[in-house]
C-alpha cells in the first residue's frame, strides 16, 4: 500500500520527547489508597506518549492501539494539539457561557459546515452529550408533538450510551444497570440490526396514542462488540421515523470525528440523523462533548439546559486543532488505508487459528476480532498477553478484541501490531 503523505508530514515534524527515562517510582498501593475503585486497571502506569507510542513509569514502550479508548485522535503530543492548547491556555482557558466565547462559535461553525447539523450544544463528555439529546427529545415530544403519554426512547440491546442514570438506562446492557434502581423511566429496547423487531416494538408502543419519541442508536456498536450497522436496517429506521414523527438520534461518541474513515459514522449508512452526539476524539483527549441537531428540533431555550465548562475556550481550541488537522492532513485517507491493512492482518491471524477466532469486523480504525464462543480464552487474557509483548488493546466484551489506534498510526506500526498480536496469541495456545 502507498505510504500516506499525512503520516510522512507527521513524522517529519519529529515529535519532541525530551526525557524517556523511567519516572519516579510509582506505587500502585498509594494510588489505590486514595482513588476510588471504579476501574479494573491493568498493572502498568503510563508516564508519557509520542505519536502512537506510550511509555510506562519503568521506561517500557508500548504501541497504543487503545488511544484512550478511541479518544487520542492525533495520538500523543501531536504538535498541532500541543500548540493549540499551549497558546490558548496562555490567553484564556475558561469563561462563563454567560458571555460569547469566540472559540466555541468557531468550533460550532466548523461542525455545522461539515455535517448534517444546524446547531451545536457543547458539554464535557459523551454521557453529557447523550443526556442533552435525551432532554431535547423529551421537550420536543411535549412541546411540538403534544404527547399525551410519557415519551419513550427506543435504544438497542448491547448498546452503550454512558454512565449517568439516564444513560445507563438508555444503555441496553443490564450489567451496567445493576444496583442503580430506580432507573429513569421512558426507555425500551430492541435488538440491533433487526428490522422486524423494531417495527413490532414501534407498533406496540404507538397503539392508541403516540409514545415513541425517538430511536437512539449507534452507527456501529462499540462497547457492544464492534458491530457495524446494517445499511438496509438503518434505511428502514429512517423511514419509520419519517412516517411516525419520530426523531432519529445517533450516538457518535466513539465512532465520530474520522474514526471510521469518514468524518461521521452516519456517512456509512446513507441516512442522516436528526440529532447526533460526539465526544471522545473531538478534542483529541481534552475533555469535550457535543450534541448536534437540525434546526427543526432545536427547541431548547435559555434555562432548559446548560454546562459550566461546556464549550470553554481551551477545549474548543483543542477541538478546532483536531478537526483542522484531520482535514488539512487528509487523515481520513490514512484511516481508510490503515484500517484495510489492519483488517487484512487480523484476517490472516483468524485464518491461522480458525477454531479460536470467528470474525474480523469494523470500519476504518475501529475494528474487532471475535473469539469463538467455544474457546476458553477471553479477550482480557489476550489483552494481557499482548501488553506483555508491548501492544495495548482493549476488550469490547468478554469475546471481542478492540483495535482503536490513533488516526496518525503508520503502515509500519500496523504491521508491528499484527506481529506482536500473533506472538502474544502463540503464548496462549
From Swiss-Prot:
Binding residue positions for pyridoxal 5'-phosphate: 126-127, 160, 251-254, 308
CC cofactor note: Binds 1 pyridoxal phosphate per subunit.
Residues forming coiled coils: none
Keyword Cytoplasm: yes
In-chain residues carrying the UniProt-annotated modification N6-(pyridoxal phosphate)lysine: 280
CDD domains in the cross-refs: OAT_like (cd00610)
UniProt pathway: Amino-acid biosynthesis; L-arginine biosynthesis; N(2)-acetyl-L-ornithine from L-glutamate: step 4/4
Impact when changing residue 402 to A: 2080-fold increase in KM for acetylornithine, but does not affect KM for 2-oxoglutarate. Retains 18% of N-acetylornithine aminotransferase wild-type activity
Pfam families, per database record: Aminotran_3 (PF00202)
Entry GO MF terms: identical protein binding; N2-acetyl-L-ornithine:2-oxoglutarate 5-aminotransferase activity; pyridoxal phosphate binding
Keyword annotations from UniProtKB, A to Z: Amino-acid biosynthesis, Aminotransferase, Arginine biosynthesis, Cytoplasm, Pyridoxal phosphate, Transferase
Miscellaneous remark of the record: May also have succinyldiaminopimelate aminotransferase activity, thus carrying out the corresponding step in lysine biosynthesis.
Summary of subunit composition and partner proteins: Homodimer.
Similarity field: Belongs to the class-III pyridoxal-phosphate-dependent aminotransferase family. ArgD subfamily.
NCBIfam families: argD, PRK01278.1
UniProt-recorded name of the protein: Acetylornithine aminotransferase
Organism: Synechocystis sp. (strain ATCC 27184 / PCC 6803 / Kazusa)
Gene name tied to this protein: argD
Amino acid at each position: 500500500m502507498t505510504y500516506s503523505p499525512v503520516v510522512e508530514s507527521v513524522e517529519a515534524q519529529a515529535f519532541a520527547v525530551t526525557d524517556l527515562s523511567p519516572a519516579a517510582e510509582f506505587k500502585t498501593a498509594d494510588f489505590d489508597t486514595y482513588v476510588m475503585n471504579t476501574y479494573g486497571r491493568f498493572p502498568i502506569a503510563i508516564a508519557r506518549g509520542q505519536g502512537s507510542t506510550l511509555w510506562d513509569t519503568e521506561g517500557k514502550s508500548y504501541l497504543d492501539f487503545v488511544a484512550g479508548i478511541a479518544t487520542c485522535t492525533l495520538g500523543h503530543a501531536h504538535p498541532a494539539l500541543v500548540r493549540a492548547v499551549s497558546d490558548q491556555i496562555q490567553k484564556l482557558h475558561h469563561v462563563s457561557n454567560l458571555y460569547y466565547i469566540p472559540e466555541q462559535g468557531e468550533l460550532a461553525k466548523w461542525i455545522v459546515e461539515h455535517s448534517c447539523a444546524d446547531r451545536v450544544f457543547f458539554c464535557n463528555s459523551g454521557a453529557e452529550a447523550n443526556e442533552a439529546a435525551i432532554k431535547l427529545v423529551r421537550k420536543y415530544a411535549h412541546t411540538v408533538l403534544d404527547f399525551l403519554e410519557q415519551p419513550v426512547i427506543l435504544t438497542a440491546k448491547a448498546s452503550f450510551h454512558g454512565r449517568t442514570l439516564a444513560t445507563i438506562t438508555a444503555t441496553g446492557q443490564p450489567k451496567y444497570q445493576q444496583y442503580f434502581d430506580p432507573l429513569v423511566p421512558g426507555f425500551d429496547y430492541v435488538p440491533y440490526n433487526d428490522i422486524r423487531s423494531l417495527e413490532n416494538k414501534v407498533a406496540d408502543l404507538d397503539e392508541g396514542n403516540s409514545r415513541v419519541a425517538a430511536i437512539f442508536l449507534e452507527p456501529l456498536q462499540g462497547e457492544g462488540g464492534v458491530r457495524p450497522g446494517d445499511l438496509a436496517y438503518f434505511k428502514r429506521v429512517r423511514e419509520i421515523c419519517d412516517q411516525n414523527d419520530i426523531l432519529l438520534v445517533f450516538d457518535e461518541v466513539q465512532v465520530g470525528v474520522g474514526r471510521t474513515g469518514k468524518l461521521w459514522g452516519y456517512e456509512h449508512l446513507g441516512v442522516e440523523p436528526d440529532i447526533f452526539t460526539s465526544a471522545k476524539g473531538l478534542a483529541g483527549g481534552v475533555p469535550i462533548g457535543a450534541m448536534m441537531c437540525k434546526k427543526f428540533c432545536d427547541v431548547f431555550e435559555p434555562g432548559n439546559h446548560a454546562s459550566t465548562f461546556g464549550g470553554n475556550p481551551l477545549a474548543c481550541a483543542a477541538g478546532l486543532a483536531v478537526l483542522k488537522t484531520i482535514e488539512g492532513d487528509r487523515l481520513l485517507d490514512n484511516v481508510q488505508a490503515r484500517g484495510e491493512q489492519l483488517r487484512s492482518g487480523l484476517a490472516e491471524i483468524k485464518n491461522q487459528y480458525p477454531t479460536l477466532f470467528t470474525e474480523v469486523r469494523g470500519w476504518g480504525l475501529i475494528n474487532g476480532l471475535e473469539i469463538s464462543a467455544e474457546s476458553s480464552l477471553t479477550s482480557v487474557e489476550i489483552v494481557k498477553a499482548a501488553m506483555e509483548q508491548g501492544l495495548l488493546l482493549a476488550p469490547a466484551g468478554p469475546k471481542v478484541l478492540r483495535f482503536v489506534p490513533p488516526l496518525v498510526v503508520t503502515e509500519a506500526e500496523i504491521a508491528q501490531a499484527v506481529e506482536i498480536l500473533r506472538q502474544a496469541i502463540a503464548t496462549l495456545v
